[in-house]
Design a protein with these regions (language model features):
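Conserved ATP-binding subdomain of kinase catalytic cores across diverse folds
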Residues: 20-133, 137, 142-157, 313-382, ...
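Short, low-complexity Ser/Thr-rich regulatory SLiMs
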Residues: 100, 167-169
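Short acidic-glycine loop/turn motifs at beta-strand connectors
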Residues: 56, 169-172
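Short, glycine/acidic-enriched loop or turn micro-motifs at the edges of active sites
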Residues: 118, 162, 183
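Hydrophobic residue at the +6 position relative to the catalytic HRD Asp in the kinase catalytic loop
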Residues: 160, 165-167
């Protein structure tokens, strides 16, 4: 336990302070013991970082503690708080700890404490497994999507990289979360130049990080770090263009505007305000998104069923629910009643089929997706086998 001295000061969320006060603040962070099961979940950082539990209970809250300069800690704490208030995908701030002293009275660095993101992993852990080009593409897409969301909020990251990001499984892909906001700041009007600066930093950092893994023999041989980093930029530009640039639509197609809005919904954005301009000859419409909001599918799912999920997990669940409703013989007009039946008859049964000793290792929404994917694979395999057996049975005896 930290020594009771007049200089130690912990500033942060009130409900967390009591747990933090029991941590060994009188020791340099590099001397803190760390649960081996947590070490693998910690990424690399320019600072010393440790993952610790709030209590000895293995199910207790996990904190990430980072030693840094007080000025940087304060700036990052404020940035994370504002990001959280604006609904950005980022870790949440817990406290700033300063006035640390060793038992001999020597000063120790300031520390910032954040809440570790459950079910997340650093990129080095994700890429050290059996990954495919598809996985790399999905990680690049997730990082690009994260950067788009931050820029829509007017946040200049200043150090976009894989190291400063945590990844969670999101159906077939990944969701990316900002984990280090030390260099970031909000702008009243984020300029194109500032966006381009973030993109250049992302291009350089991602290529360098993947090159390190390639030299370490972790990446598969066909992996090109520079090409992978470029894919982040390409995906970012594609999303940003879809969200901000005008689309010219045929005025005589009454479904054109609906399709334009659906194309944005498919990538996870709701169109809350749009500007439509009719050409002078009335032959075309110009569709201009004016206000877009992320998490289109996950917000719909939360409102309908109360489930909190990642965006593309929600998209998969909503598709399953739509199929469920389409098969109902007596279809109730109340969508919320049908949603509760689906939760009871489908979702809870699928998730509940997992053995107790395996529960909790994966988010329920991700587990639901993976079980359905496995069932689809088995059904497809069975169909192919039956088709092969049928073909063999129809062969002439002389074959």
């Amino acid at each position: 336990m930290a020594p009771l001295n007049s200089q130690l000061r912990i500033t942060g969320l009130g409900e967390e302070i009591s747990a933090l006060s029991n941590l060994p603040w009188e020791k340099p962070l590099e001397e803190w013991p760390e649960d081996p099961s947590l070490t693998a979940q910690r990424g690399i950082s320019r600072h010393i970082v440790r993952l610790v539990r709030s209590t000895p209970d293995p199910e207790s809250e996990i904190y990430a503690v980072k030693e840094t300069v007080e000025e940087f800690a304060t700036r990052e704490y404020e940035a994370l708080r504002e990001l959280g208030l604006r609904g950005a995908p980022s870790v949440s701030q817990i406290a700033i700890v300063n006035g640390r002293l060793t038992p001999k009275g020597e000063e120790l660095p300031c520390a910032i404490v954040t809440r570790f993101l459950p079910y997340s992993l650093p990129y080095r852990v994700v890429l050290s497994g059996d990954v495919t080009q598809h996985d790399i593409t999905n990680m690049a897409n997730a990082l690009a999507y994260l950067l788009v969301r931050l820029h829509l909020l007017g946040f200049w990251w200043g150090d976009c990289s894989l190291s400063n990001t945590l990844f969670r499984r999101d159906a077939d892909g990944f969701a990316a979360y900002l984990v280090d906001a030390e260099t970031g700041e909000f702008q009243k009007n984020l300029s194109n130049g500032q966006r381009e600066h973030d993109l250049e930093l992302a291009r350089f950092n991602v290529a360098a990080e993947l090159e390190d893994l390639k030299l370490a023999g972790v990446l598969f041989p066909a992996m090109d770090p520079i090409r992978a980093s470029e894919s982040v930029i390409t995906r970012y530009r594609k999303i940003w263009k879809a969200l901000s640039e005008p689309q010219v639509l045929p005025a005589n197609d009454r479904h054109a505007v609906e399709r334009a809005m659906r194309s944005l919904q498919d990538i996870g954005f709701a169109v809350e305000e749009v500007d439509l301009q009719l050409a002078g000859d009335k032959s075309t419409l110009t569709f201009i998104p004016k206000l877009v909001a992320p998490n289109y599918h996950s917000l719909r799912l939360k409102e309908l069923m109360g489930l909190e999920t990642e965006e593309f997990q929600a998209k998969r669940i909503l598709a399953s629910f739509d199929r469920f409703r389409s098969r109902e013989i007596s279809r109730t007009p109340d969508k919320h009643e049908a949603a509760q039946r689906w939760l009871h008859e489908v979702f809870n049964k699928v998730v509940g089929s997992v053995p107790p000793d395996l529960q909790g290792r994966v988010e329920d929404a991700q587990l639901f997706h993976e079980i359905l994917e496995h069932r689809w694979y088995l059904d497809r395999k069975s169909t192919r086998l039956n088709s092969s057996h049928s073909s063999v049975s129809r062969m002439p005896s002389s074959a």
